[in-house]
């Protein structure tokens, strides 16, 4: 088994949680918390944090959008064009101006000045339209004049459609006789950018132009074809679930469905509306995704199950909230698939195609959307998902371009994208993935459309705080277990076997990465000890051991109840067998308590199977025999040594594994798929060394067996084997995720 891990990541220093804005800077604290007298207060804080997070499942909080609220405030009454339809919005604008004269979101990012300018000007227009708030208008105009240079500043984030909408609102301001004293050069630059944007749109395909102009309808003025805009009206009466666009449409057309949507939003939110409504499905999926990626989902399993069930119902119903938004569709597809729900890729790939054709123009795509689509496209489970493969390749190219062009302004997001491209979800151990998420986590996860908006479900310091504390708790347990493993290694005298690789640190790291939860200590120790032993036995058969020693070890395991002082042919065999027997008995005793039946004989049989196959490989090498590729794979997927490492641990993770389950074809299929993938990956990497040493190797044998009269090139053979690995990996993932007789938590271990 060839897994590359950073040992320090799993048994090294802990994360500091006192300062959590950048968790990656907090890897310098030891075990103080585990022994601190403040443990009680830490535990209380831990539970309080869990409680706050749990409440998010029952209330979807969205930040107020001053921009959208201003546009809703401009809507006239359906019975009188001289009166506002939503006076509560006007009152909210009057009462919520900032001290500097702007209408900015609290604690907004310093790179969102364009957003603040746009929102402030929209609020000014709303107040002026209805002849109220003279003082607020004056202060707002002063803010716009003072900060007008930011409208063309390159370092600022540009909201969707800003270069068209903001100049249009300036025109409206002049039409309302608002006296704005604007710097001429900046104003000319802004007008030039607007004309350039309009020209670029006119040169794009008509469908993309049409949907983009519909999204920014409030900024198009006389250029807007309102009848074409209404093609995008949704069942809830909105245009793109956007209060501002829908408000502009009602002002232009007096469409009753638009008005009903606005009434619905006001009834839900009161006097101010968000930038997007509804956003319930996406918001809840973001919450689930955050908890899963940060490794704390197990604390909220009931709530998460409810979200997944609701989302699946919406998926089956073809809910617009999922399928009319690429990010929501991608997140739903990935989350549902990875949690075992049956969702085909057809609907998702259509959403991706729409994203890159007409439904979501390039003006509106951001890196977060592309990244979300890319992550979803990785979840390929079936051999015939050709379109999903194509979209995966396309999305990868787009993200690579974003990285190489340096267009990603956030260093944290840049690191997340790079990590996603470097490590497919299946190529990084779960514990390592959680650590990376903590390191790169930003809890101020602001989203940008025509204006900025956020929700505590998008990013939240409580998520990070709970994750860091949980990580540290697990780390403390892992360190204690590692000390126990170190002691065991020496007590069993395995450290005296100088020919063997001293791999117990590596072995424990793979165990901790596979079973992070504190309660799975027995499974971790079983995995780690058997991993150490299989490495030593492998070295005995491959490097040091004589034929007599190999045969003797096999005989000892077959007989089992033997006197090691008289029946071992060498000191090395005595040490190995003694450690092996005591470890199997220890695991058997622990397994008996959980399973209610003896599992020792099965563990012995697993070990014997490996030893027999290792002996066969040893004989091939000794006799310089060349097996066929089929003969080799039949033996080598067992001799890879994963059986003794993985299979005994299944008995220790909690659920009962009956004899019928262990004998079931699915159990054996899971093992064969996992071990075959690992064997092929290992043989590709170790090709040169094993060929030089005269040992059978899958890549070498495949070159001979598949090349006809001429040996296949190494590169071509690697490509063929990688395709085979990918097919096997998909089948393995599919088998793990599908409902079956084997408990899910046991099946998931085969995917580690």
Curated annotation (Swiss-Prot):
Q: Which domain of life is it from?
A: Eukaryota
Per the Swiss-Prot or TrEMBL annotation, the motif DDXXD motif is positioned at 538-542
Q: At which positions is Mg(2+) 2 bound?
A: 538, 542
Q: Which residues bind Mg(2+) 3 per the record?
A: 682, 690
Question: Which key words tag this protein in UniProt?
Answer: Chloroplast, Lyase, Magnesium, Metal-binding, Plastid, Transit peptide
* Classification via Pfam families: Terpene_synth, Terpene_synth_C
Coiled-coil residues: none
Q: Which cysteines are joined by disulfide bonds?
A: none
* SUPFAM superfamilies per the UniProt record, alphabetical: Terpenoid cyclases/Protein prenyltransferases (SSF48239), Terpenoid synthases (SSF48576)
GO molecular-function terms, A-Z: magnesium ion binding; terpene synthase activity
- Cofactor(s) for this protein? Mg(2+)
Which tissues carry this protein?
A: Highly expressed in leaves.
Location of the protein in the cell: Plastid, Chloroplast
Q: Does the keyword Transmembrane apply?
A: no
Q: EC number(s) of the enzyme? A: 4.2.3.-
Domain comment (free text): The Asp-Asp-Xaa-Xaa-Asp/Glu (DDXXD/E) motif is important for the catalytic activity, presumably through binding to Mg(2+).
Task: Please describe what this protein does.
Answer: Involved in the biosynthesis of ent-kaurene diterpenoids natural products such as oridonin, miltiradiene, eriocalyxin B and nezukol, known to exhibit antitumor, anti-inflammatory and antibacterial activities. Catalyzes the conversion of ent-copalyl diphosphate (ent-CPP) to ent-isopimaradiene like compounds.
Assigned protein family: Belongs to the terpene synthase family.
Question: Could you identify this protein by its name?
Answer: Kaurene synthase like 2, chloroplastic
């Amino acid at each position: 088994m060839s897994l590359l891990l950073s040992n320090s990541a799993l048994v090294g220093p802990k994360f500091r949680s006192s300062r959590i804005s950048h968790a990656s800077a907090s890897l310098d604290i030891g075990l103080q918390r585990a022994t601190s007298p403040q443990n009680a207060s830490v535990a209380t804080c831990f539970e309080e944090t869990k409680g706050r997070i749990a409440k998010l499942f029952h209330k979807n909080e969205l930040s107020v959008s001053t921009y959208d609220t201003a546009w809703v405030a401009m809507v006239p009454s359906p019975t009188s064009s001289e009166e506002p339809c939503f006076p509560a919005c006007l009152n909210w604008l009057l009462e919520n101006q900032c001290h500097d004269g702007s209408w900015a979101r609290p604690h907004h990012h310093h790179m969102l000045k364009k957003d603040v300018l746009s929102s402030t000007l929209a609020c000014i227009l709303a107040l002026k339209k209805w002849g109220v708030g003279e003082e607020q208008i004056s202060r707002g105009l002063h803010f716009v004049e003072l900060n007008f240079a930011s409208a063309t500043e390159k370092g600022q984030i540009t909201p969707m459609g800003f270069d068209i909408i903001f100049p249009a609102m300036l025109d409206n301001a002049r039409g309302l006789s608002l006296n704005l004293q604007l710097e001429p050069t900046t104003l000319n630059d802004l007008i030039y950018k607007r004309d350039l944007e309009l020209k670029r749109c006119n040169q794009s395909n008509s469908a993309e132009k049409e949907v983009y102009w519909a999204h920014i309808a409030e900024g198009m003025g006389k250029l807007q074809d309102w009848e074409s805009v209404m093609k995008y009206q949704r069942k809830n009466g909105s245009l793109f679930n956007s209060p501002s666009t829908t408000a502009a449409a009602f002002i232009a057309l007096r469409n009753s469905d638009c008005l009903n949507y606005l009434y619905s939003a006001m009834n839900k939110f009161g006097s101010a509306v968000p930038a997007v409504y509804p956003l319930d499905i996406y918001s809840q999926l973001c919450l689930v995704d955050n908890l899963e990626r940060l490794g704390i989902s197990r604390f909220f399993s009931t709530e998460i199950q409810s979200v997944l069930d609701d989302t699946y119902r919406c998926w089956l119903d073809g809910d617009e909230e999922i399928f009319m938004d690429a990010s929501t569709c991608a997140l739903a597809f990935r989350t549902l698939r990875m949690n075992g729900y049956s969702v085909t890729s057809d609907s998702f790939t259509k959403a991706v195609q729409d994203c890159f054709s007409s439904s979501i123009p390039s003006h509106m795509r951001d890196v977060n959307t592309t990244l979300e689509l890319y992550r979803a496209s990785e979840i390929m489970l079936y051999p015939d998902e050709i379109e999903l493969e194509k979209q995966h390749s396309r999305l990868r190219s787009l993200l690579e371009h974003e990285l190489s062009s340096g267009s990603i302004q956030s260093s944290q997001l840049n690191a997340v994208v790079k990590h996603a491209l470097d490590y497919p979800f299946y190529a990084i151990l779960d514990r390592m993935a959680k650590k990376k998420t903590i390191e790169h986590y930003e809890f101020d996860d602001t989203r940008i459309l025509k204006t900025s908006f956020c929700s505590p479900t998008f990013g939240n310091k409580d998520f990070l705080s709970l994750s860091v504390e949980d990580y540290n708790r697990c780390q403390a347990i892992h360190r204690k277990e590692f000390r126990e493993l170190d002691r065991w290694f020496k007590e069993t005298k395995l450290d005296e076997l100088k020919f063997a690789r001293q791999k117990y640190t590596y072995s424990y790291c793979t165990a901790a990465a596979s079973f992070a939860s504190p309660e799975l200590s027995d499974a971790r120790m079983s995995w780690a000890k058997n991993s150490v032993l299989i490495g030593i036995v492998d070295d005995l058969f491959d490097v040091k051991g004589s034929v007599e020693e190999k045969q003797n070890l096999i005989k000892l395991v077959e007989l089992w109840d033997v006197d090691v002082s008289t029946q071992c042919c060498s000191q090395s065999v005595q040490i190995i067998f003694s450690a092996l027997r005591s470890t199997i008995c220890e695991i058997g005793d622990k397994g008996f308590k959980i399973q209610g039946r003896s599992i020792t004989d099965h563990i012995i049989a697993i070990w014997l199977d490996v030893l027999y196959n290792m002996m066969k490989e040893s004989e091939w090498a000794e006799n310089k025999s060349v097996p066929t590729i089929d003969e080799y794979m039949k033996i080598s997927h067992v001799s890879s040594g994963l059986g003794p490492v993985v299979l005994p641990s299944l008995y220790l993770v909690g659920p009962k594994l009956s004899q019928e389950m262990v004998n079931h074809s699915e159990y054996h299929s899971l093992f064969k798929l996992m071990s075959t993938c690992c064997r092929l990956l290992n043989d590709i990497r170790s090709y040169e060394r094993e060929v030089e040493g005269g040992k059978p190797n899958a890549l070498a044998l495949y070159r001979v067996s598949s090349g006809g009269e001429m040996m296949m090139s190494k590169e071509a053979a690697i490509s063929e084997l990688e395709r085979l690995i990918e097919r096997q990996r998909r089948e393995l993932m599919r088998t793990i995720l599908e409902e079956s007789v084997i408990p899910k938590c046991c099946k998931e271990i085969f995917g580690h």
